Amino acid sequence: MKYLCIALLSLVVFSSFAQTGTSRTAMVKGKVRKEGGEGVSFATIRLNKTDIAVLSDAEGFFELKNIPFGEYEVLVTSLEIQPKSFGIVVNRRLHELSVDVLPQSGIDLDEVKVTGKTEKKEIETKGFAVAVIETKEASLRNLNTNELLDRTVGVRVRQNGGVGSRVEYNLNGMSGSAVGLFLDGIELSTYGSSFNLNNIPPAMIERIEVYKGVLPAHLSGDYVGGAINVVLKKDASQNNVTVAASYGSFNTFQSDLSGSYRNMKNGFTTRVSGFYTYTDNSYTTWGKFSKFVHANRTLERYYRAKRFNDTYKSLGGRFEVGFTNVKWADLFFLGYNISDTYSEIPHGTTMARPYVGRFAEYDAHVFTLNYNKNNFLVKGMALNVNAVRSYRGTFVQDTVGQMYNWDGNPRMLIRNGVEIPVPPIAGMGQQGPKSITDINRRITNMRTNLAYTIASGHRISLNHKMETTDRDDNDLLKPVNKDLVTTSNIMNNIIAANYESQILNNKLRTNLMAKYTINRTIQTKPEIITEGDVTIIKRNKNRTVNNNRGYGATVSYNVIPLLYIIGSTENSYVVATEAQLYGDPDNNILENPGLVPEKNINYNIGFRYGAVNIGKHKLTLYGSTFWRNGFNKISLRAVENQIVQGRESDGDIEFTKYINLGKTQSRGFEGEIIYIYDNKLNALFNFSKFNSLFKQEYDEKGKPHDLYDLQLPNEPFFTINGSVQYRLNNVFQKSSILNIYYNAGYVAPFSTVWMASEWFTTPTQFYHDIGSSYRLPNGKMVVSLDLKNALNAEIYDNFGVQKPGRSISVKLNYTISKFL
């Protein structure tokens, strides 16, 4: 890391000298806002009598770049405001403006039609199968990032219970290591279990990009199912501090804080954010997977019980210091993330048996470096470097031997006509042998992207990703010296090249990608052996090396105004992660170092139409279909044998591991409709339907495979989401805003085991959420109220684990702007 910093700083200094002779240009940035401070989204800011223009973002912020020094007239227009013009003298490298405007009393039919693309539209029409989630409204409500993702077309968030439980993301049948999770372009796993999508509040997020299939250049990696990239807020044009706190059912308290400061003269910038979450997760379960074992060994299903031993507490902070929009860098930041989490483990893979006294603790210290420069060394060249070094610790304790029931009391048996607690088995904990496991990880992750525009509409880029993970596993109940510690090392190197083009008046956009990956794993397990009278330490090494090539392409064609045909294809590999190879005891995952890379051949084709404006009405349509062929799919192992009546407990597993399935095939389609009326009513409807089938026709003995053509278990394959939002202005107070929300979700029944079984099929899930938010006239305070799962429906997820029923919460948001 030290050498990386020195090298990059040298590069930065060199680039600053290399550009001293360039022409004098500036940036004009700021915010268009109405009375009360509310930002005006998608307003046009134009320098009159020039071709320089830009749209403000969803919060009213804008940036005009590369403006030659001189005098200009600025014209600001939008359908919802009265046009405004004013003069400006550009005589320094950065000008920051606050443009106050008046609301439009009526629509002027002679107003010039403004065309342009928002960041969301720009990403969604590049040819990738991608959806962009904007978080402006969600940040004001008591919603977490995973809930936003779960409402997105084609995305299913798989969670093993309540807040803080293990999460896996399914993108139209692809999950696990096939799906990448990124935070500002860096793998989220680098930051540790404490800093995950459960804990990062929407208030800290600018947008979420959900890719299905081929990934853009800056996210190159061993992923074939797609990726989720969380882009944190970076704007520092206005010094501000935002705080939020919420309290709700199950004794759940959440709070977050974020702030930014920028020195307008020299570009010095600081950003700070943090969060705290606490919950008892004490919700009630009552469905078919909730069971009680009586003293006479009879099993009672549909047992109503309140969850226990499920406390979750997490605290984290992110600190960054650097420079923005200066001569030698568009962005340069050094950062530090710290997080700490305590999480009780209430049960194993399924809910069959509750645990008491089994818990995990996590800590992470993460150091980051980000550098970004457009027109680096020469005009048209861009350099982006992200580097992370993290130190992560995981502590798992399981030392209680007593078995428990879901009423919170010890499991009983009848002996000599008397009910007594089931005697603990010597040396056994809740899930297996008693243990106190301490896992330490040291992770280095560096991504470099160098892009060059060789001609208008033609761009090439070269990307390199290097990631290493060193892991040490210790059992503190059986302490040994450092020579007997199990060590694991993983190194991934990926080189990727991309060519992007925009031709035919920018109607046709293509992206060609090729990559080469080198993956190496080494695990050393020492053991003490005696040969004659001599005791020695034997080091058993398991080493693997594999090299893989991949390629892909995307295309987007603007057939007619507002209609885009989008397609992509990819042939690539994905390798197992460190947790899949070497286990994850806090998540009930066993090791399987024999996993081999998974190969996938994917095809996607779809369209996006809109937004079509008809008077006060806006309509956007999206549809896509996909076909995915997988080989050696890396998947969680599920029960394969037929569940026999009277032996349903055979399907109750407390732990599992990742395995390689044979050939698989996933085909399906998805669609979405978005309707907006008068910028007050917003309605959304989306669905996803696919069949993910096992296609290995014969087993290793050449006999017909029992699982051939069966649906892969534990995967919801048909989901529907719908939501409605309505805005009311000037309610109770002038210039206030009241938003009312409604959301509904549907999940079709799916099996948690391979062979059909009534007892291991989740029922139909249909749930409703309602909520509201009230923004005070000064625009600084927002109060929101949310009622989730309002009808107290049964909701299930991974391996039939029941999720919370009805819950209510209230949230306060407060923003302090322009404090310096």
Indicate where each model-derived feature is located:
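N-terminal periplasmic accessory domains that precede
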Residues: 96-100, 145-148, 165-170, 182, ...
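Gram-negative outer-membrane beta-barrel transporters
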Residues: 504, 517-519, 525, 620, ...
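Face-selective signature of the C-terminal outer-membrane beta-barrel domain
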Residues: 322-325, 330-340, 362-533, 546-552, ...
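Short, acidic, small-residue-rich periplasmic hinge/interaction motif at the N-terminus
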Residues: 33-35, 44-46, 77-81, 91-139
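Short acidic/polar hinge/loop motifs at secondary-structure boundaries
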Residues: 65, 186-213
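Membrane-embedded beta-barrel scaffold of Gram-negative outer-membrane proteins
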Residues: 566-570, 598-659, 665
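Extracytoplasmic beta-strand/coil segments of soluble accessory domains associated
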Residues: 130, 146-187
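C-terminal beta-signal and adjacent terminal beta-strands/loops
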Residues: 573, 630-638, 740-767, 772-820
